[in-house]
Swiss-Prot record:
Molecular functions (GO terms): RNA binding; RNA endonuclease activity
Record keywords, A-Z: Cell membrane, Endonuclease, Hydrolase, Membrane, Nuclease, RNA-binding, Transmembrane, Transmembrane helix
Protein's organism: Borreliella burgdorferi (strain ATCC 35210 / DSM 4680 / CIP 102532 / B31)
InterPro entries per record: HD/PDEase_dom, HD_domain, HDIG_dom, KH_dom, KH_dom_type_1, KH_dom_type_1_sf, Ribonuclease_Y, RNase_Y_N
Protein name: Ribonuclease Y
Keyword Ribonucleoprotein in record: no
Positions of the HD domain: 324-419
Main location, first listed in the record: membrane
Membrane topology, record value: Single-pass membrane protein
EC number: 3.1.-.-
Main enzyme class: hydrolase
Cellular compartment(s): Cell membrane
């Protein structure tokens, strides 16, 4: 019984195992079938995607190829059009060149034709001139001289009549105006009175110092006179040296230089050059200070630095014995008072009055030259002064026509300041003008660097540029200057012309 039961259990177990195995196989077959199906579907999908990608790529390549073909065709068309335009331009240029060549040929032909006609006209003109000369008995130059002399004579006669009449009228008017205004104006101002002299003396500690100033073979005094341009007079005057110079700036330079050399005791050419340089800087500082001082005293603002320096130079200048800076300041005060009484702008009038003689502060203009008004006006204009001020400066000697009432007031104020008793002296001014004229004649020649009129105008010392003037040219230059002095000046006795040509080489030992 147990055996049967055990056998039944075993048989059931075997049967269950077999059923399980069979079912597993069936499941495995289904799985394999599904895998094959999935694999086939995947391969189909991959193949479809590959075909789609290839198709898209071919389509894109085809589109790009078509676009490139279109671009190439367009570029070819542009190149063809450009070539056509270039050919057209070349044809146009060729036509223009051909036309210009034809026009040039016509111009050349016309020029030749005109030259031939001009030649014929000149020949006829020369023939007519010869006939006129034969008929009149005068050459062409003689006839021209006669006509010019006649016109010149008539012009001078008419001009002299007008000048005499104008001078008489101006004199009567100036006297009347000066007398009427002088009473009310001059009593309201106070001015300083100063006299200018052309000589100065320097005190010496002893007479032995004179020999040191002269130096060995006169080299020290020659160096002084050459560098300064003043005449150093050493005579029998005890313990004193006299400085003679028409230019007050040089006179002051010489005086201060000698005083400093005497105090220091070292007197030789190198020391003289050093002291002259230092004193020149001091005088330049004084010029700047005096210019600023007069501007401050008159309460004038906005003047250019060049104008201030020009005013400072007037501190050392004189006109007919009257200090030019004091005269300008006095004129400015008078002009301001007159402007207020006449209801004009006192600031503009005062400014123009102060600057009316600014041209005399320029080195190239002599103290009383008529050209100082125009030169001063040009300087003022370059410094930015107003047209009213510029015209007033230029017109204060009637070299140009006054264009405003302010310019007339400047003339009146200038005349009042100059015409008051004791303001000016004639002799000093003539002396200064004569010496200045000597220097101006020398400066008119090329190559002249410095020029000094010394010995009261009996000698002119001229320092020339050794790079421009050699020894042979120095002789010719001295002769030409002497001839020009003879032709343009009147003087007693004779004037010595000295040309100084110096070559200086400097090297330093280190």
């Amino acid at each position: 019984m147990i055996y049967i039961i055990f056998s039944s259990i075993f048989a059931g177990f075997i049967l269950g195992f077999l059923v399980r195995v069979f079912l597993g196989r069936l499941s495995l077959l289904d799985l394999e079938k599904n895998l094959k199906k999935v694999r086939v579907e995947s391969q189909l999908e991959i193949e479809n995607e590959r075909r789609q990608i290839i198709a898209n790529a071919k389509s894109q390549m085809l589109k790009e190829k078509n676009q490139q073909d279109r671009d190439i065709r367009d570029r070819k068309n542009e190149i063809v059009n450009l070539e056509k335009r270039l050919l057209q331009r070349e044809e146009t240029l060729d036509k223009r060149i051909s036309a210009l060549d034809k026009q040039q040929s016509r111009v050349d032909f016309k020029i030749k034709e005109f030259e031939q006609k001009e030649k014929v006209i000149r020949e006829k003109e020369a023939d007519l001139v010869k006939r006129l000369e034969n008929i009149s008995g005068l050459t062409r130059e003689d006839a021209r001289k006669i006509v010019i002399e006649k016109v010149e004579h008539e012009s001078k006669r008419d001009a002299q009549v007008i000048i005499n009449k104008s001078e008489q009228e101006a004199q009567l008017l100036a006297d009347k105006v000066a007398k009427d205004i002088l009473v009310s104006t001059m009593q309201r101002i106070v001015t300083e009175v100063s006299s200018e002299f052309t000589v100065a003396s320097v005190e010496l500690p002893n007479d032995e110092m004179k020999g040191r100033i002269i130096g060995k073979e006169g080299r020290n005094i020659r160096a002084l006179e050459t560098l300064i341009g003043a005449d150093i007079i050493i005579d029998d005057t005890p313990e004193a040296v006299v400085i003679s110079c028409f230019d007050p700036i040089r006179k002051e330079l010489a005086k201060r230089t000698l005083e400093r050399l005497v105090t220091d005791g070292r007197i030789h050419p190198a020391r003289i050059e050093e002291v002259v340089y230092n004193v020149t800087n001091e005088i330049n500082s004084i010029i700047q200070e005096e210019g600023e001082k007069v501007v401050f005293d008159l309460n004038i603002h906005g003047l250019d630095k060049r104008l201030i320096r020009g005013l400072g130079r007037l501190y050392f200048r004189s006109s007919y014995g009257q200090n030019v800076l004091s005269h300008s300041k006095e004129t400015a005060i008078i002009g301001e008072i007159l402007a207020k009484e006449m209801k004009l702008d006192p600031v503009v009038v005062k400014r123009a009055c102060l600057l009316h003689d600014i041209g005399k502060g320029m080195e190239s203009i002599s103290d009383n030259s008529e050209g100082h008004a125009i030169t001063g006006a040009e300087l003022a204009q370059s410094c930015g002064e107003s047209e009213i001020v510029v015209n007033a400066i230029a017109a204060h000697h009637n070299e140009v026509k006054p264009e405003s009432l302010e310019a007339i007031v400047v003339q009146i104020a200038d005349a009042i300041s100059a015409s008051r008793p004791g303001a000016r002296r004639e002799s000093l001014n003539n002396y200064i003008n004569r010496l200045k004229r000597l220097e101006d004649i020398a400066y008119s020649f090329e190559g002249v660097q410095k020029c000094y009129a010394i010995q009261a105008g009996r000698e002119v010392r001229i320092i020339v540029d050794n790079a421009l003037i050699n020894d042979e040219k120095s002789i010719l230059l001295a002769r030409d200057i002497a001839k020009k002095i003879e032709a343009e000046m009147r003087y007693p006795g004779k004037i010595k012309v000295t040309i100084i040509r110096e070559t200086r080489v400097i090297e330093y030992a280190r």
